[in-house]
Structure formats: structure tokens, C-alpha cells
Amino acid sequence: DCTILGAGGAAKAIAYALTTSNVKSISIINRSQENANQLSQWIQNNSNIRVTTTTPEHLSAVADLFINCTPLGMWPDTEQIPMNMDLVNNNHILVDTIYNPIETQWLKSGNAKGAKTIGGLDMFIAQGLASADIWFGKKISNQINVDIIRQILIEGKRFKRFPSIHFP
């Protein structure tokens, strides 16, 4: 079972990826029930996955995987978290789409409770590579060393300001 926190553009991209996986059910948690219902309908139109929607106040710990697609915890409001951490334990996986900071307070709290956590930096890099393919009109992303990009970004003062990368 998977829970998507949020129902915007990032949530739709995550939902698309989940529809191509072996996920059996998705729960969408969003402040706006209308947006959650729209995403739910999109998933149901494109898959056979069971989908439920609710608001953050009614979130439960039923899911194995929680994916944060909200801006909660993003710089400069880094202390915000998208869910009640009393629901998290060492059986959960927390995935954050936020890349600034690299490790959000939500992920730190999840780590402290023994959950497996995954930050949003790799998704950020993948978006950039996909954009480069579009900009250059050909697939150049497979020629780029992702490890170097990741290292540059990690060493870039934790994104307080993005490092200046100059192209020759």
C-alpha cells in the first residue's frame, strides 16, 4: 500500500510511476478534497489500482510507503513536516520529492524512528536531465555523469544558494 501526500503536479508524476508498478492500492492525502478526487479519477482511468482519498487529519499508518509531494519542509520553511510522525515506524518507507534541503526534517524524523528514507535529490537531477534532452533535441542525458552532478549539488552549501555551474 502506498500513500501520496499531496495532489499537485509532482503527485501526478508519482502516480503515473506507481500505475506502471506493482502497487495494489494508493491513498491520496490532500487538503483539497477536490484535487485529491481529480488525481484519484486520473489513476482509476489509467489503471486497476484501488484508490482512496482523505484529508491530512484522517491519515492512518496503513501504508508501507509514504511519498511527500507537498512543499512542506522545503527551504526556507524547513521545520514543517507533511504528516503526524506518531504514525511512522521502522516498517515504513518515506520518500520525499523535496531536494532543498537534501534531507528534510520529515526524513530526519523518519530515520530516528527507524524508517527507510529517500530524499528528492535524484528526482531533481532526473528532471534536469530530461529537460536537457528536450532542450538539445536529442538524448544527451545518457552521456552525463550523474554522480558528479549529485556531488556538486551536495557540496553546494546544502542549497542555501544553488552553486553556479558555468558551461564552456
Question: Which role fits each region the language model picked out?
Answer:
Residues 1-19:
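Glycine-rich adenosine-cofactor-binding loop
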Residues 84, 90-142, 148:
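Rossmann-fold NAD(P)-binding glycine/threonine-rich loop
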Residues 21-46:
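NAD(P)-binding Rossmann-fold cofactor-contacting core
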Residues 4-5, 28, 96:
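Hydrophobic Val/Ile/Leu positions in short beta-strands of Rossmann-like dinucleotide-binding domains
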Residues 32, 58-81, 95:
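Rossmann-like NAD(P)-binding element
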Residues 20-25, 112-116:
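Conserved S-adenosyl-L-methionine
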Residues 142-168:
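A short, charged, Gly/Pro-tolerant segment at domain boundaries
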Residues 49-63, 86:
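Short acidic low-complexity segments
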